[in-house]
Swiss-Prot record:
Organism: Caenorhabditis elegans
UniProt GO molecular function: calcium ion binding; mannosyl-oligosaccharide 1,2-alpha-mannosidase activity
Pfam family, one: Glyco_hydro_47
Region (Disordered): 88-112
Family that this chain belongs to: Belongs to the glycosyl hydrolase 47 family.
Keyword Transmembrane carried by entry: yes
Gene behind this protein: mans-2
Keyword Hydrolase on entry: yes
Listed name of the protein: Mannosyl-oligosaccharide 1,2-alpha-mannosidase mans-2
Amino acid sequence: MKTVRFNKQALAILAACFIFLLCVVCYFSASSESHNAVVVGERARGHIAVRDVENRHLAEEKHAVIHAKTVGKIERVVSQEKVEILRPARVESKPPGEKTSTEPEETGVGKAPIQTSEGLEKLIGKIHYENKDEENDLRRQKVKEMMIHAWEGYKNYSWGANELRPMSKKPNSQNIFGGSQMPATIVDAADTLFIMDLKDKYKEARDYIENNFSMAKSTSTLSVFETTIRFLGGLLSLYALTQESFYIEKAREVGEALLPAFNTPSGIPKSNLDVASKHASNYGWANGGQSILSEIGSLHLEFLYLSRISNAPIFEKKVKKVRDALEKAEKPNGLYSNYINPDTGKFTGSHMSLGALGDSFYEYLIKSYVQSNYTDTQAKNMYWDVSDAIQKHMIKVSKQSNLTYTVELNNGQAQHKMGHLACFVPGMFALQAINEDTEEEKLRIMTLAEELAKTCHESYIRSETHIGPEMFYFNERDEATSKHSENGYIQRPEVIEGWFYLWRLTGKTMYRDWVWDAVQAIEKYCRVDSGFTGLQNVYNPKAGREDVMQSFFLAEFLKYAYLTFADESLISLDKWVFNTEAHPVPVLTN
């Protein structure tokens, strides 16, 4: 019996020991799992800095790879030891609503409609950065401060009107907008506010558009082109950025209001439209009442995207008919005249220009090819054909400084002048360069783009203000200057736009520096208490100001400047296409 009692006690002791050891094991096991979870969390936050390109499929971490867009940058990133550099996920960082000491405002703001900072950055790219670049951070914040200044001036003195007269502190109305209460600045600037993460100010714009914007407020004749690129383009971009469905409704309202302008025998729209009466007309000065190439050729991005998001094929059909007519029309030397008859679909006159009257048509050909995810072969073929003709007939080199520039043609005769508007061409050729098939052509076209960008830069630095004129000439007394006529500045963005593309597509910091110089010049010579003005004469700042703050100053100039100093993933050129008013719409992937 004693033996039995002893065995029972021993078993009890052993059982107790076993339970104790089991608890100890569980405790340390839990601690180990917790530690492992921390380690995994550290990996997820990006502490692994590199990854073998050949074994990338084995990695589970969802880091953002630094994506270089030019051939040279891609080679530099991938070719060294077959390693990609990884950018850590932004897990520990502050949410977009919080500001560092260098960021102007915003306080007490609500969430953007995109719901979360993670969702926002997934959609449009990095808003905040873990790899700090102090110089360009400060530049970017300065541009943001300029945007705030411009917006506050408009809000205080012209809210709900087209634009602001910043010196007079009164609303400005142009007849292109269809009446004084079409809020061009609000719709044009809203996506810039969103991209800059200015939540309070974006919400002001958003709420106004949702509750007040209506084409029924168009009480006079409007420009079909300007309404498309500013209002329709702005609304489409806002939908693409935020995914808020009311923007589709507003955009469709604009698109439907514009349809009567297309009711011509050829399908080519007229320039002007009275929305109430549905009466369309052309300008009398346009070669006797013809339609204008830059206007009819710069509707495709917007109408195509509107059809896709609204499931309304009518809009795409309208611009496809325009494209077909342009492709069919006879073109001397492969070049497009600035004027076309909307009844016959035939070009009239022989004035060709990459500046006013022609410009954005060419831009939209290559951008339509990109927007289609490189499937729109009609746009591709039309663009490459006319690009060859432009290079043959409309590109010249100056005798004095060997500056490459574009000319206008009139009856086959070259006019040796280049407009500020034509300085979008470097960006256009840069897009062409990265889509060329051979390395030789990539280099040749990119070199052309850079030479043209240099000429546009010369037009800026040869003025006293370091701001370029409306038009600059190449002759015995002028070279990239315009000291005798057309020497004002009305806040045009094309020069900045071209440098933005070249920064993104070549990675050369020189273009960032050029943009920054222009930003500083605008700040110095154009800023007033309630916004920004133009200049009467860029060679003589004492000559006076242009008392208008254009809606495109907020939509284009400040947006392109901001993006030049931002992370390259923010509105990536791989995923987005800018319309000619700098409103981004997505590349269509299905």
